[in-house]
Amino acid sequence: NFLGSNLRTTIGMGPQEGRVLEEGRAYPDNFGKWNHIVTVWDNTLSEGQLKMYVNGELFFSKTNDVKNDAGVLQNYMPNTRNQNMWAFQEPTDNSRCMTGFIKKFRMWSTAKSADEVKTLMNSDVTGTESGLVCAWDFTSVAEDVTNIPDKTGKHAAKIVGNYKWFKAGN
């Protein structure tokens, strides 16, 4: 929950912990149904822009306004220290986590346009696509929830906390 919203995204900005660009909004009217949700970090603007799409339509856009103590605009910091990525849960507060289901998860190295988001919404990936960083399909029960390989063969996920699997088609 971010500022009373129940659909949000957060990315790290700058080298200091706690400098994050965050935006959230009330969940769309179709709450409780499957939704295709995409978050895009677009650095084609000098300050960068965070965008979220729901079912192929732009849901929100926020221009980066995160500054350090000296007033210098901070930019997205890639994970050069090889730290674990946290998704759908706050690393310092396990009670702040996602409630819902994830069918597929993809991460790309380049920002996707609105048209690309719409195309990818109804397509699958093999793991060899240019710019695909990682991809998981959570459509069948994993053999080992502490080591779930992605489709690229480069990464593994670990499920933490309470979870349950649903059969495909549910």
Each model region followed by its residue ranges:
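Extracellular glycan-interaction patches encoded by glycine-rich segments
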Residues: 75-106, 112-123, 170
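Extracytoplasmic low-complexity segments
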Residues: 76, 118-170
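Acidic glycine-/aspartate-rich tracts in secreted/extracellular proteins
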Residues: 43-46, 57, 91-92, 107-115, ...
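Acidic active-site catalytic centers that drive phospho-/nucleotidyl reactions
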Residues: 42, 55, 103-104, 150
